[in-house]
Amino acid sequence: MAIKAEEISALIKEQIENYQNVLSVEEIGTVTYVGDGIARAHGLENAMSGELLEFSNGSYGMAQNLESNDVGIIILGDFESIREGDKVKRTGKIMEVPVGDALIGRVVNPLGQPIDGLGEIVTDKVRPVEAMAPGVMQRKSVNEPMQTGLKAIDALVPIGRGQRELVIGDRKTGKTSIAIDTILNQKGQDMICIYVAIGQKDSTVRTQVETLKKYGAMDYTIVVNAGASQPAPLLYIAPYAGTAMGEEFMYNGKHVLIIFDDLSKQAVAYRELSLLLRRPPGREAYPGDVFYLHSRLLERAAKLSDDLGGGSMTALPFVETQAGDISAYIPTNVISITDGQIFLESDLFYAGTRPAVDAGLSVSRVGGSAQIKAMKKVAGTLRLDLASYRELEAFTQFGSDLDAATQAKLNRGRRTVEILKQKLHAPLAVEKQVVILYALTHGFLDSIPVDSILDFEHELFEYLDTNHADIFETIRTTKDLPEEERLNQAIQEYKDIFLATKGNTSSTEDKLKSIQNA
């Protein structure tokens, strides 16, 4: 079959019309130094701060130092296979992590990659790890409570949705236990929790995840783990990655709780990177921008205005102190950024007061306006009572004679300390907290032996659940106290039963005092 000349010319014309002159331009540099999680590269004159760069082995890095001759890069992943002379190219993107519902119930690394062995995470949504915090007009005052389930916190230092509340204390004072109990208490509260573990042993994180699974809390929780064995760059970006995951929910009108455990280790990782990148050291060898490191992170937690959906992100950053020194650099920085702090005292912890919240040093600057009416009524004077008890307790060490009023204050104080104790992984619903604190502040516990207080509390809840469930229901629905007469009658009913069955109205402590006086 002969080919016609017209057909050939038509084909050529069509190809010319469809021809596109596409030039693929890549800016490629050369690695001049690599080691300890950082690299330097020459030839990336147009690289931008925070830009994602790709190495020839497939690893990624983030541009940090933009110098006249080279670029300082932190390597996000395996740096041992990168060699001097390797190529590194610009991507024109900033670092992003996968976000969305697919991450709920999973354990991921700071790059959003699954590390729990449950398969791939299928999501098409991504968010940049660094983002602008909401402005003043995009925010709303904190007005909803975020219940932790811990009496010592919900009564003395209440937290609201959208607040930043620092948890600070020495190692082994129960900071992580507060985090886990708070997550457990969010069950059924329409809250998504993100637990960011920074610089912890993988075995410790595994234990926490098992606890969350046991109580059904992984159904609404994402765990981001940057373990102690990970390179410093991953510890540095972990909190930002967790916050980006939380922002996806917050900007869609949902409520998020994010816990950073802990920011001291992130600051140490950032100090390591800064010193390796030859940035000038400042106080305690931290770089000059270590305040900005934490402020730009924590400012992203907010209660959004109704125009933006009314979502919220509540942040609980943890900071570890050395020998209770809260005047060190990182603790003072984070105290000044947050809306209050919960100080955990090691002496209280070892004395058996757990959670070991120091009522004198702990404060919540905005949470009071989010407390429910019932809690405000019963816990209003609790902090002052506790502070005056601690003061009086110090004086009684001298063994001076006490008048009846002082003795009554001491007795009430001992019972207050006892009632604020709580078992591990046993968060209390707010209505139950209100009832037991009401019983305390209205003198129902004054004749109960101190060593029987927690037994009385547990059995009182069982009695009310069975015989007066409407009391709990009223507090839960109205957020206010039921009729005082009804509440007094119910508590007195059970108190009479308790004292009759125990057949003892004096504690061991009171008996010893009577022997000494005799």
From Swiss-Prot:
One cellular-component annotation, GO: plasma membrane
Record key words, sorted: ATP synthesis, ATP-binding, Cell membrane, CF(1), Hydrogen ion transport, Ion transport, Membrane, Nucleotide-binding, Translocase, Transport
Catalytic reaction list: ATP + H2O + 4 H(+)(in) = ADP + phosphate + 5 H(+)(out)
Protein topology in the membrane: Peripheral membrane protein
Record EC number: 7.1.2.2
PROSITE patterns (UniProt xref): ATPASE_ALPHA_BETA
Annotated positions for site Required for activity: S362
Gene3D superfamilies, alphabetized: 2.40.30.20, ATP synthase alpha/beta chain, C-terminal domain, P-loop containing nucleotide triphosphate hydrolases
Keyword Ion transport: yes
Domain of life: Bacteria
Sample GO molecular function, one term: ATP binding
Class of enzymatic activity (EC top level): translocase
Subcellular location, record wording: Cell membrane
CDD domains according to UniProt: ATP-synt_F1_alpha_C (cd18113), ATP-synt_F1_alpha_N (cd18116), F1-ATPase_alpha_CD (cd01132)
Residue numbers binding ATP: G169, D170, R171, K172, T173, G174, K175, T176
Main location: membrane
Similarity field: Belongs to the ATPase alpha/beta chains family.
Assembly, per entry: F-type ATPases have 2 components, CF(1) - the catalytic core - and CF(0) - the membrane proton channel. CF(1) has five subunits: alpha(3), beta(3), gamma(1), delta(1), epsilon(1). CF(0) has three main subunits: a(1), b(2) and c(9-12). The alpha and beta chains form an alternating ring which encloses part of the gamma chain. CF(1) is attached to CF(0) by a central stalk formed by the gamma and epsilon chains, while a peripheral stalk is formed by the delta and b chains.
Function recorded in the entry: Produces ATP from ADP in the presence of a proton gradient across the membrane. The alpha chain is a regulatory subunit.
Name of the protein in its database record: ATP synthase subunit alpha
Organism from which the protein derives: Enterococcus hirae (strain ATCC 9790 / DSM 20160 / JCM 8729 / LMG 6399 / NBRC 3181 / NCIMB 6459 / NCDO 1258 / NCTC 12367 / WDCM 00089 / R)
